[in-house]
């Protein structure tokens, strides 16, 4: 499963851009609201809300802002309904792209996503057109310096799918979608505190890009991520390190 680290360069680039754009608060406010609406306002009994709460606190969101988002989700405050919608399509070079959104106006969001695909030389597809190329997984990440052997042993005992050690020494533990929270809790109980933990869409196949195509694909990803309603963008693009270095 070491191949999953191929997409780390795009992910890290995305995280830097999220912070730069100041979009991260909006993203987690929406996730808090939807998580609370679906599973209730108690993070102790709502694992999705607990994960969103951890992310929001990690982004230095104030407790007051968090509480308002949760209250909106459980119906304690007024506000337009926010729903989760997914979009699928192909970008330049035949790269498969999945877009996760949260929106209070599906027509606005669909039009904006379609425009991004069209402008960047891609095509917005129908439901299922590229979803079969991805698996929904849990990814629990640990910073370099953690005891690798002990972490691997604890992860396997917790029924994790695999453990990947990256070039920088950080370690990713991958889980099934359904087993994500149980594995995360088991690792915490064993004394391993994650640097990050999230549900992701991992590609089962990859499209290796040259410099020209990589520029076009990243332009599409940037344009999609700039949309206010977009939460996450996943692709099966594999950009070799030497190409990523040329991109800067």
Curated annotation (Swiss-Prot):
<dbReference type="InterPro" id="IPR048300">
    <property type="entry name" value="TACO1_YebC-like_2nd/3rd_dom"/>
</dbReference>
<keyword id="KW-0963">Cytoplasm</keyword>
<keyword id="KW-0805">Transcription regulation</keyword>
<dbReference type="InterPro" id="IPR029072">
    <property type="entry name" value="YebC-like"/>
</dbReference>
<protein>
    <recommendedName>
        <fullName>Probable transcriptional regulatory protein PSPTO_3980</fullName>
    </recommendedName>
</protein>
<dbReference type="GO" id="GO:0006355">
    <property type="term" value="P:regulation of DNA-templated transcription"/>
</dbReference>
<dbReference type="GO" id="GO:0005829">
    <property type="term" value="C:cytosol"/>
</dbReference>
<dbReference type="InterPro" id="IPR026564">
    <property type="entry name" value="Transcrip_reg_TACO1-like_dom3"/>
</dbReference>
<keyword id="KW-0238">DNA-binding</keyword>
<dbReference type="Pfam" id="PF01709">
    <property type="entry name" value="Transcrip_reg"/>
</dbReference>
<keyword id="KW-0804">Transcription</keyword>
<dbReference type="GO" id="GO:0003677">
    <property type="term" value="F:DNA binding"/>
</dbReference>
<dbReference type="InterPro" id="IPR017856">
    <property type="entry name" value="Integrase-like_N"/>
</dbReference>
<dbReference type="InterPro" id="IPR049083">
    <property type="entry name" value="TACO1_YebC_N"/>
</dbReference>
<comment type="similarity">
    <text>Belongs to the TACO1 family.</text>
</comment>
<dbReference type="InterPro" id="IPR002876">
    <property type="entry name" value="Transcrip_reg_TACO1-like"/>
</dbReference>
<dbReference type="Pfam" id="PF20772">
    <property type="entry name" value="TACO1_YebC_N"/>
</dbReference>
């Amino acid at each position: 499963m070491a191949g999953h680290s191929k997409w780390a360069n795009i992910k890290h680039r995305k995280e830097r851009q999220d912070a730069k754009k100041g979009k991260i608060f909006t993203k987690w406010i929406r996730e808090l609201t939807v998580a609370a609406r679906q599973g209730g306002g108690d993070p102790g009994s709502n694992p999705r809300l607990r994960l969103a709460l951890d992310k929001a606190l990690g982004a230095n969101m104030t407790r007051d802002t968090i509480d308002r988002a949760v209250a909106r989700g459980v119906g304690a405050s007024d506000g337009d309904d926010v729903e989760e919608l997914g979009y699928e399509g192909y970008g330049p070079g035949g790269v498969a792209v999945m877009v996760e959104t949260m929106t209070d106006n599906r027509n606005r969001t669909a039009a904006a996503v379609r425009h991004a695909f069209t402008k960047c030389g891609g095509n917005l597809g129908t439901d299922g057109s590229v979803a079969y190329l991805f698996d929904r997984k849990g990814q629990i990440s640990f910073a370099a310096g953690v005891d690798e052997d002990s972490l691997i042993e604890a992860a396997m005992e917790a029924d994790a799918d695999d453990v990947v050690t990256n070039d920088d020494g950080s370690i990713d533990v991958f889980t099934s979608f359904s087993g994500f929270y149980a594995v995360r809790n088991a690792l915490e109980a064993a004394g391993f505190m994650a640097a990050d933990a999230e549900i992701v869409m991992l590609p089962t196949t990859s499209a290796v890009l040259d410099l020209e195509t990589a520029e076009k694909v990243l332009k599409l990803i940037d344009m999609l991520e700039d949309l206010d309603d977009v939460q996450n963008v996943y692709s099966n693009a594999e950009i070799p390190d030497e190409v990523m270095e040329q991109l800067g």
